[in-house]
Amino acid sequence: MKTRLVSSLALMVVGVVAAVALYVPKPMAQGPAIRPLVTPTEYERWQVELSNWGRWGKDDELGTLNLISAVKRKAAAALVREGVTVSLASNASTEKGPDVPCPVEWAMITATEANAADRIGYPCIHGAGTTHLDSFAHRFFNGKMWNGYPVADLVTLGGGAARNSILTMKHGIVTRGVLYDIPRLKGVPYLEPGTRIFPEDLEAWEKKAGVRVGPGDAFLVRWGRWARRAKLGPWPIDEGAAGLDNSVIPWLKKRDVALIGWETPGYVPQPPGDLPRLALHDFTLTILGVHLIDRADFDALSEAAAARTRWEFMLTVAPLPIPKGTGSPVNPIAMF
């Protein structure tokens, strides 16, 4: 009896040892990889390697708008088949709110049976109250603006912008516009704040939509700011927004776009150690020489383009001819 018990115990031990030997633990599931950030060193190197300064001569004030030739404008006009127009501007915000710290000033100054008139003022032309076009005299790097012009000599509080002002675009911008509708790519109504849009997202959209932005085009990117606002209400946009990741900078240089339009100029909240929120905004404006349309509203354009399965169109942008101005309110128009 004792012998059988010892034998049984021995067999049990052998079985356990064998089971342990055969067990191979599976690797633990990993969460989504955190994309590396563009480092300050890379950012500084790109300022030299990707710069367009001097490309169109030492006296240039147009930057990549030089890529919009008469031939380019005629090709854009050929995209008009129906004569349907769509505004890309958000309505001017005349009341202060969480996302409008500096509203547009508006008031009636007369209203009689004979006539009526109002007054409108833009105390913060680059603020969150209106869709606007930035000139190169708006943001700078180390005391220099687009094409290397010294800021101290050419942009002053008393004299405004003697170079690179909004007046350089008095005759307007007409070119091919291309919409990159990232929420539609992802199958969502809008992206959540903090979402970073990478070059592969842009190229995935190109594959899905069958369209590609190129030299002299207007690159318009939608993340769904206004759709989110309509559903959830206003929120401080400087504290919560999606947008293009800084890794898009070399992609923009390669594509040679003439103009960029977006709903917000950056993404927040940002990962620890990231570059400042306006790093991409400032690089494109000052180093690449690409003018920017800030606070655009692409929701109506998204619907119009989807209804036609056409993501390219003629785009016109006409800033006010403000001498020595750093920017202007605009109402960009897409025409199908």
Question: Where do the model's predicted regions map?
Answer:
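Bacterial N-terminal signal peptides that target proteins for export
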Residues: 1-13
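Bacterial N-terminal signal peptides
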Residues: 10-21, 26
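Active-/binding-site microenvironments in catalytic and ligand-binding cores
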Residues: 27-336
